[in-house]
Amino acid sequence: MENVILNCQNLYKHFGKKEILKGISFEICSGDILGFIGPNGSGKTTTIKLILGLQSIDNGSVEINGFNVVKNFEKAIEKVGAIVENPDLYMYLSGYDNLKLVANLYKGIDSKRIDEVIKLVGLENRINDKVSKYSLGMRQRLGLAQAILHKPNLLILDEPTNGLDPEGIKDLRELLVKLATAEHMGILISSHNLAELESFCTKVCIIKNGVIIESSEIDVVKSECSDSYYIFDVDDSKKAQPVSGGGLPPGGAKLVNVSQHAVSSLA
């Protein structure tokens, strides 16, 4: 039986009269890497903030390791690591000193664990350099090291590929796969670009205007769309289907109410 780490059920969130989330549900199990995909303003970051208790939930529930985030916040959040937006780093300190500061916030993190995490993220040769000398990709890896020091089983990353070059994205991809397998983590990674995530995610959820319009195993998406997968923005998907006729691209298409930000080749 799969070990469910994160369970989000029927989440709603309003800001004033604007409805941001409209009853979204999904779950993450141990070893899952879930790509949470959607254009800017779709509700990705709001969802993450609800999961982490940074914003209040209007309706619905979030459970982490069986603990309700609202009713038992400390227990729910104790095995969670997260980077929302950019890693929080002291640029004038070394990478090692940054990790020591975070380690002091928890009980039981010794130098052996710090060294273990440094090796895991591949910063052994630069860990004593000042962070100001790090590349963006190296800072991202140091941020990940901070997030996993206390051995969480859920890792949440909000748009971690922003600003990374192709080599940095490749390094991040390999590191996340290693964490999911070696550390048995469940990982939620948000992005507006499915193409950056589809090669290593095990699941995908596509969100638009606060609604999840596609949720499945990534292998299922690939098998259904053997050549390319296209998502078109239409006013009425039922009416558009017969009209599309032979104009559909090879490999199939899905006609839903979603921005073309989600269009991606899944060859």
Describe each PLM feature range:
Residues G60-K71, K75-A76:
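Conserved ABC transporter NBD signature motif
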Residues K151:
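Conserved catalytic motifs of ABC-family nucleotide-binding domains
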Residues L155-E159:
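Catalytic Walker B motif of ABC-type/P-loop ATPase nucleotide-binding domains
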Residues K100, S111-R126:
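Conserved ABC ATPase "signature" region
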Residues R173-V263:
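ABC transporter nucleotide-binding domain
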